[in-house]
């Protein structure tokens, strides 16, 4: 397994100082891993995953990471964070303890487990900071390889900034595109499709993406021969390698994890090529060790053979670095021993400081609560039980907020109701204290799912659509063409990409002529690669651009759903408001033809991407209004255009590109008095047909288009209708128990609509199976106007059989 190190040269005093500083950083990082594991095993922390064994290669990578650059990595990169000066040892332990104080844990405010890193791109008001004055780290996620799609967008932004001269003025985001995205990944995770899809796209697009693969030979317990072709990712990727006459491809570099000098030279060469020439590079770092195993969940001694464990001790990168220092006469054994001892003490100090800072506010909170209860003038009948609870709370040496809240709730249950409000000071005290604590903890753990800035879509002024008297009737797609033209003219940072988006102007011609007018960088075609289309948009949005990522059909969003769910939807939340990605995902869906061109799986989406707004316009005018709203907002959104509406006639608005449609505001399409019918998207036209049919049978239906599912009816329009009609039907093309069940829960439970019901609420949905092919297949798979008619008429028959006799 060993390999000869590169030839050594004499070093200067400055270089000596740098080497010893690197050695100190590596030692401190290793000790942080060791002590961090101990904190978990002794119960102070919940879980630990560390970067031991990867210290030396990360020192090298950090040398060439500069202000304005971006990292898109994973949970092994603590040494890189320390060496880059982005994280302190106190930050490391604060993260391990789950400290919610952003000054101590700026990465995520206690919302993610340890070693999940992020820098803060936004100020306290949610505005962009100057990202060129800091080293940037995009927020990590646990799903391995999940960082790869995002890295494509972070790198592609540099290409856009370099080539689009109109964007050179955006100096808080770029220095003419010289920024590199550094991605890191473990060797086992290179087996994920995200990895290959990202590398392929990066090679095709020619972007400055520098990928480091930490190859320690295992994916938890599974050895590399079961993971990777040829047991080597660099060998497996030979076909990607850029030859002398190749137009596209990647450069591949290999180095040993313990070869300090060789690693420095390898990263110097690779990053220089990547930065200057915008060629993706892969650093395959081999012979990596993992001294403590995968995580605190278990020991690697269970699955690694004795020979491997012995080799890992011999080729530990820090030990090898020490031997190299001694052999080169850079420092003496005594000097290195002193550095080692000081590293241990420094990490112990950081651990102690972080723990004290974490515990102090909780201890103060506990003592304050006990004091408040004890000074109460109220003496309840169950005072002995209350005193016992307080004593138990006081005895907890390292309390959590949960301990205090739980005690408060139990005490509240014991307070008697025999006292008058004037006498029962204890109940007032405990109730107010609990309410205040819930409000505080809402901010600690539940804030920033969506934007709270002035650019929140809920703060965007509604601008109604305006029509001239002689407004022409046009195909719906033409409204989108005109609206896109306005967007790309108004916002130089706006761009759109997807399959068939560029050259032919989209499969439904909604971007006709846009590439010719705005260029193939802003209006661009992509390969068939939905996961990285989403990642491409996500990364660019994090760097100040305004991307629109088109997924050709809603059915194919599933390929990219993991990226939306785990990364995009959680970004603002998991950084406690520190990062944002105002990406618009554009797609088209609902009924058309066949299993995979008629999908409307809204329940799958709305239940997996909370944090992304889900907008379901009934026509292209409403869709255009949503695009305009979201371009003014800093939240991400999924806009699902009705697939069968591009050739339907609509009036051309006079204020195209300017009108907006508010989020969470249903529209009453038809007023009625008997039944409330709630739907969205393509189902609106079907519902309108059913309403007309029912009118002929003396049934008055109030038809409501919800317009957006996330958010849903913020003004309680639907429950106000239900208060009038006392009967309600929810209608869509999702599966039974899908989005109709979601809407029902919102209206009946959350809005309290159950109290107005005079009849059992009903749903009209598609079948459990996918929609069959052909007109008849659609008719017998998806709900139609006749189904809606029958459901509502049956409801009226049950309510008043004399007025509405059985007709079926």
State each model region's role.
Residues 74-75, 145, 151, 184-185, ...:
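Short beta-strand segments
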Residues 60-61, 82-87, 193-197, 215, ...:
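Short acidic, glycine/serine/threonine-rich loops at helix termini
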Residues 55, 59, 136-408, 643-808, ...:
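Thiamine diphosphate
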Residues 579, 589-593, 597, 602, ...:
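Active-site phosphate/pyrophosphate-binding segments
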Residues 31-212, 217-219, 223-247, 595-597, ...:
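Cofactor-binding active-site loop characterized by glycine-rich and histidine/acidic residues
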Residues 1-46, 75, 449-461, 791:
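Cofactor-/ligand-binding subdomain signature composed of acidic, glycine-rich
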Residues 383-543, 555:
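Non-catalytic terminal/interface segments that mediate subunit docking, oligomerization
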């Amino acid at each position: 397994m060993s390999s000869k190190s590169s030839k050594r040269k004499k070093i200067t005093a400055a270089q000596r100082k740098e080497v010893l500083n690197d050695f100190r950083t590596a030692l401190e990082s290793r000790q942080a891993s060791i002590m961090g594991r101990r904190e978990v095993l002794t119960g102070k922390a919940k879980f630990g995953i560390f970067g031991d064994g990867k210290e030396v290669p990360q020192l090298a990578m950090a040398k060439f990471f500069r202000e304005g650059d971006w990292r898109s990595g994973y949970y092994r990169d603590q040494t890189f964070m320390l060496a880059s000066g982005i994280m302190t040892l106190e930050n490391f332990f604060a993260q391990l303890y789950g400290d919610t104080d952003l000054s101590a844990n700026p990465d995520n405010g206690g919302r993610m487990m340890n070693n999940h890193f992020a820098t803060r791109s936004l100020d306290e008001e949610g505005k962009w900071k100057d990202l060129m004055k800091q080293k940037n780290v995009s927020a990590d996620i646990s799903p391995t390889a999940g960082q790869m799609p995002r890295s494509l967008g972070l790198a592609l932004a540099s290409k856009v900034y370099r080539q689009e001269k109109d964007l050179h003025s955006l100096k808080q985001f770029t220095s003419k595109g010289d920024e590199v995205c550094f991605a890191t990944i473990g060797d086992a995770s290179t087996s994920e499709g995200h990895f290959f899809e990202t590398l392929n796209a990066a090679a095709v697009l020619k972007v400055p993406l520098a990928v480091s693969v930490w190859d320690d030979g295992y994916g938890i317990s599974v050895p590399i021969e079961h993971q990777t072709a040829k047991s080597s990712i660099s060998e497996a990727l030979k076909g990607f390698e850029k030859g002398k006459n190749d137009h596209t491809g990647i450069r591949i570099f290999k180095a040993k994890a313990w070869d300090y000098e060789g690693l420095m030279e390898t990263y110097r060469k690779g990053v220089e090529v990547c930065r200057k020439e915008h060629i993706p590079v892969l650093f395959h770092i081999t012979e990596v060790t993992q001294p403590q195993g995968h995580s605190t969940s278990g020991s690697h001694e269970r699955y690694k053979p004795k020979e491997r464990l012995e080799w890992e001790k011999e080729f530990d990168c820090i030990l090898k670095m020490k031997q190299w220092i001694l052999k080169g006469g850079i420092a003496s054994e005594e000097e290195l021993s002193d550095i080692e001892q000081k590293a241990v003490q420094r990490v112990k100090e950081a651990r102690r400081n972080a723990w004290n800072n974490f515990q102090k506010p909780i201890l103060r909170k506990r003592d304050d609560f006990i004091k408040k209860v004890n000074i109460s003038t109220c003496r309840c009948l169950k005072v002995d039980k209350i005193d016992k609870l307080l004593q138990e709370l006081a005895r907890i040496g390292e309390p959590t907020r949960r301990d205090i809240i739980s005690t408060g709730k139990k005490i509240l249950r014991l307070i008697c109701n025999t006292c008058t409000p004037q006498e029962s000071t204890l109940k007032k005290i405990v109730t107010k204290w609990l309410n205040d604590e819930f409000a505080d903890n809402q901010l600690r753990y539940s804030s920033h799912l969506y934007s709270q800035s002035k650019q929140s879509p809920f703060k965007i002024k509604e601008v109604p659509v305006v029509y001239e008297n002689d407004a022409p009737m046009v195909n719906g797609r033409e409204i989108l063409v005109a609206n896109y033209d306005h967007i790309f003219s108004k916002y130089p940072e706006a761009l759109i990409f997807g399959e068939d988006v560029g050259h032919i102007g989209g499969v439904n011609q909604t971007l006709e002529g846009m590439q010719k007018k705005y260029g193939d960088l802003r209006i661009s075609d992509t390969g068939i690669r939905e996961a990285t289309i989403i990642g491409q948009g996500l990364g660019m949005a994090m760097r100040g651009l305004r991307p629109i990522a088109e997924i050709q059909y809603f059915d194919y969003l599933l390929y990219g759903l993991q990226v939306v769910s785990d990364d995009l939807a959680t970004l603002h939340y998991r950084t406690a408001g520190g990062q944002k990605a105002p990406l618009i995902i554009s797609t088209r869906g609902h009924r058309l033809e066949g299993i995979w061109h008629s999908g409307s799986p809204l329940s799958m989406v709305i239940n997996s991407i909370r944090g992304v707004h889900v907008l379901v316009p009934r026509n292209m005018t409403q869709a255009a209004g949503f695009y305009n709203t979201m371009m003014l907002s800093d939240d991400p959104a999924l806009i699902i255009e009705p697939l069968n509406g591009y050739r339907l006639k609509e009036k051309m608005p006079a204020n195209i590109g300017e009108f907006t449609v508010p989020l969470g505001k249903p529209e009453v399409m038809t007023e009625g008095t008997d039944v409330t019918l709630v739907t969205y998207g393509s189902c609106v036209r079907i519902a309108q047909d059913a309403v007309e049919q029912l009118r002929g049978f003396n049934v008055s239906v109030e038809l409501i288009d919800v317009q957006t599912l996330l958010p849903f009816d913020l003004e309680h329009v639907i429950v106000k209708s239900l208060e009038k009609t006392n009967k309600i039907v929810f209608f869509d093309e999702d599966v039974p128990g899908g989005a109709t069940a979601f809407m029902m829960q919102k209206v009946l439970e959350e809005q309290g609509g159950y109290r107005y019901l005079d009849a059992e609420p009903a749903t009209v949905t598609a079948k459990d199976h996918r929609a069959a092919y052909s007109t008849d297949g659609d008719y017998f798979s998806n709900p139609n106007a006749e189904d809606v008619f029958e459901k509502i008429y049956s409801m009226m028959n049950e309510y008043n059989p004399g007025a509405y006799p059985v007709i079926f």
